[in-house]
Every structure is written in C-alpha cells, then in structure tokens.
C-alpha cells in the first residue's frame, strides 16, 4: 500500500531511478494504492542522457510493494522494495526492459506487456 509522497524505485530502463507518487488515479476515496494501480509520479532521480528528466510528471503502474498482497488461495506475497514501471498517456511502456520480479496480478489488470518483459513473474 503506497500513499501520496511515497518514493519508489523504477523497474524499467526509461532513465528514471527514483520517483515520488503525487496522485492516485483510482477515483477511490481510499488514498492508498496496490499492485496494478496507475499513479501520477514525479521523477526525483534520473540518469544523465536518459529518456526522462528530473522533475517530469508522468504516469506509472505499481509492480512491487513491500507490504505485498494476499492471494485467493491464502498465500501472501511480499517484495523487497516498492517499484513502478513508467507508462505513456496511452498506456504503453516508456522503457524497453523491465527489471526484477513482478506480481502475477498484473495479468488480470491487462498489463500483458509488462508480464512478457519481466524476467520473473511471481
């Protein structure tokens, strides 16, 4: 569960290294987000000569959270860090690679491109 002003790692090669969540695009009264939710982020740290620059405001999909999630079969899955993948306005990925494991629940939300690029799906 991530809230506004939470800082996350970026799990793709778009050029950003760390972002801060500034808005949840769920339309929900609950302000927290979970895996598969779309959020508005601002880039806090970026590599030089990357696709994105520091200070840019972009959309992102949450792919890993430290809090984890409970599956229907009763198992609980947690990750070591909070991570997002940057997307464009039309929903396509900004980067061409995805680093680290991602949750299987992204398939249910329709992010098949992230699933196919990820090295491991848990």
Curated annotation (Swiss-Prot):
Q: Which InterPro entries match?
A: Ribosomal_uL14, Ribosomal_uL14_bac-type, Ribosomal_uL14_CS, Ribosomal_uL14_sf
**Record keywords: rRNA-binding included?**
yes
Pfam families linked to this entry: Ribosomal_L14 (PF00238)
Keywords per UniProt: Ribonucleoprotein, Ribosomal protein, RNA-binding, rRNA-binding
Q: Which PROSITE patterns match?
A: RIBOSOMAL_L14 (PS00049)
Q: What does this protein do?
A: Binds to 23S rRNA. Forms part of two intersubunit bridges in the 70S ribosome.
PANTHER family given in the database record: 50S/60S RIBOSOMAL PROTEIN L14/L23, LARGE RIBOSOMAL SUBUNIT PROTEIN UL14M
Subunit info here reads:
Part of the 50S ribosomal subunit. Forms a cluster with proteins L3 and L19. In the 70S ribosome, L14 and L19 interact and together make contacts with the 16S rRNA in bridges B5 and B8.
* Protein's UniProt name: Large ribosomal subunit protein uL14
